[in-house]
Amino acid sequence: MFTTHPQGRSYRSSVPHHHLRQPEIQNSYDQHANNPPRQTRRRPLADMIGHPIHFLTGQFAGQTIRAELDEIQKADLGRKYARVDRRPLDPPPVVRLRYFDIREDDVDQERGTEIKNYDEIQTIGLMSTVDLFPVPNESWTSRSPTQTSFSSSSPTLSNGNENFMFSSPQTSSPTAAQSQASTPNSPSSNDIIHYVGNHAITESSKVTSSLVGATFVQPAIVDYEGKKTIIFVFSDLAVKIEGTFLLRYRVFDIYSRPRDREDLLVQAECYGGPFRVYSTKEFPGLQASTDLTKHLARWGVRLNIRETERKRRKKGEIGSPLDDPKSKRKRTSLGSEDDEASDED
């Protein structure tokens, strides 16, 4: 049966109904009559990530919108950060943001209809941020798809003098991984947020403090796959430690609040593909810029462009591609000149 918490919240009593005396039963009913339960339950913040959200303020005020984030270009490698020679991840990670309008007459109330004209979206106030997680080398040789559910933990991220409440998801795993997660030495299921193969990524393993550069970026609207698209480009991101990692991307709008909420809500998130960060001596060099990187640069996104591959020059080696002026990285006309520091040991 239901009894009432001293603060007015109801909960199910563990005492069987027939063990309560009649006055206690009557008092319980009287208290419920005086303090009826709320008809609508507030969904935990974490459960709202990637799900339809009814906005009270912002550009979607009065609408129910679902946001979706996916990585369209992952980093392959990076060189361990050094103050004298800072090298960002390459190629630059890029994520795409899509919005879906949920209407009463939609057959699929969870998915909705994608917004057609992203030129009409107000990008001022939209931000994306990243977190860094380590990944064992053997766990990502064959990645398997995962499904995402969400826990109720809400870590606070600080940006200047403002604190933003963000929610952490929890990811369900394949059967084999779930059985592995139940072993005594495995991480707590409440801490698991994602799977790479059979390896569980946990919130407590986060090493975001090892990221250097722009961890919060603003969007750009470009032509991608034949239509205007909102993207976030992390072109100035380096890692201070060696190893294999992945990025978690999150997006939020500082001017939008959902109904009955005052917290800054993460609208969507996704996990990127693994990449490796090398020491200076082991760094193999950089490939020519990808077609997507060059395409984004033509749309005015500030990026480093390489026309040819740049291999690491070894000691005593002559005729390295680094000596070829065409192999030098260059910035687009909207950016400043790129650091031409050598890859020499």
UniProtKB/Swiss-Prot annotation:
Superkingdom of this protein's organism: Eukaryota
GO biological process: sporulation resulting in formation of a cellular spore
Sequence ranges of Polar residues compositional bias: 1-13, 24-38
Gene3D superfamilies: Velvet domain (2.60.40.3960)
Stretches with biased composition (Acidic residues): 336-345
Keyword terms of this UniProt record: Nucleus, Sporulation, Transcription, Transcription regulation
InterPro entries, per database record: Velvet, Velvet_dom, Velvet_dom_sf
Low complexity: compositionally biased ranges: 141-158, 167-184
Pfam families, per the entry: Velvet (PF11754)
All copies of domain Velvet, residue ranges: 62-306
UniProt region (Disordered), positions on chain: 1-43, 138-189, 310-345
Subcellular location: Nucleus
GO cellular component, one term: nucleus
Expression induction: Expression is up-regulated during fruiting body formation.
Similarity comment: family membership: Belongs to the velvet family.
Biological role stated in the UniProt entry: Velvet-domain-containing protein that probably acts as a positive regulator of sexual development.
Protein name listed in UniProt: Probable velvet family sexual development regulator LACBIDRAFT_317102
